[in-house]
UniProtKB/Swiss-Prot annotation:
Source superkingdom: Bacteria
Protein name: Histidine--tRNA ligase
Any single GO BP term: histidyl-tRNA aminoacylation
Coiled-coil zones: none
Family statement: Belongs to the class-II aminoacyl-tRNA synthetase family.
Quaternary structure and partners: Homodimer.
PROSITE patterns: AA_TRNA_LIGASE_II
Amino acid sequence: MTEKLQPLRGMKDLLPDDYKVHDYIINKARDVGVLYGYKQMSTPIVEYTKVFNRSMGESSDVISKEIYSFLDKSNDFVALRPEFTACIIRSLISNRLQHKLPLKFFSTGPVFRYDRPQAGRQRQFHQLNYEYIGAKGAITDADTLKLAVDILKALEIEQDTTLELNSLGCNESRSVYQQKLVEYLNDFKDQLSEESKIRLSKNPMRILDSKSETDQKIIANAPVLSEYYTDESKEYFEELIQYLDILGVKYSINPRLVRGLDYYCHTAFEFTTKKLGSQSTILAGGRYDGLAKIMGNNDDVPAIGFAAGIERIALMREYNISEVKPVFVLPIGKNNICYALEIVDKLRTENIAIIIESLGKIAKRMQRIFNENAQFIIFIGDEEQANNNLKIKDLKKAEEYIVDFAKALELLKK
């Protein structure tokens, strides 16, 4: 017996009904981005693995556990992209776009992470991604956060989310804080989870993200980053808060919200929800002024961005999306097909969606049409062909018309 082929675990087909929702989400988000000056771009799904090794760090969960990386036929290590930001910055550098800064980019498409599949978390999933590159300052961060809010509003889910906000401060603030955090955690080293013990020496701030209950109890009394802000860091965060208040953006300051990579600074944020269980983050981002230099640029490039998971957005609510119902053309006999094709072609040039139903018995063809919940059927038989007419049945009104092409066009475009 032939093996029944299935998609890989954690990877799903997007069938038409799924794709309709995805397309709706993408179009809504794109339209909001246009109002903020964002332009769409695309990068390859496959990149050299070193692009992500540099951007995420080899000790990160994504690189050490989740990345799809393999040796290609040229003996190069390549990877399916696990996120967009590194790809966008790589593109900025390789296309020498630095002299055109500032730039605002919108991207969308699949990303890949080898994770345990569950509701709202797949191994292939799709993201909306926004990057504002070459602009610094709290005003830029406020504008980016307002963009995120407006996207969630356009998708009718903003009311079910909470903006969690924090400042990572400047390099000096984080350096002092990291030292104090390590001193505190060293006293509990034997009680930490195995994963956090590894992070303690490589990336201690990532311990604050730990899901371990034991770790969380220890972290509850750990020093807080805001206690070590420089004056510059305090002023930056206070300015951001002022702008958000002016814009009417609601937020909750979460002092434990961090990013564990050195190139992140100042603003970090997540939009979370209680509607999706453990997969509570809908949209997340932050400022990453140090990434471009890590990836080979001569200088640091200020930047801020965020990504949102399309599948998670789709789980937040049901979208009633109207779609164009095609008109069905049904030639009665084989000798009516040529005339039917002429009619179909003429109607399509008038931007009317048409499906020709010519296969099988009339009863089966009619059943397929009923299953599509169509409104109009055009019957073409010998009489219609001889008189150069069309018989149109309106299934919703239960009415029938025999008209010429011009009248048919008028009727179908109402």
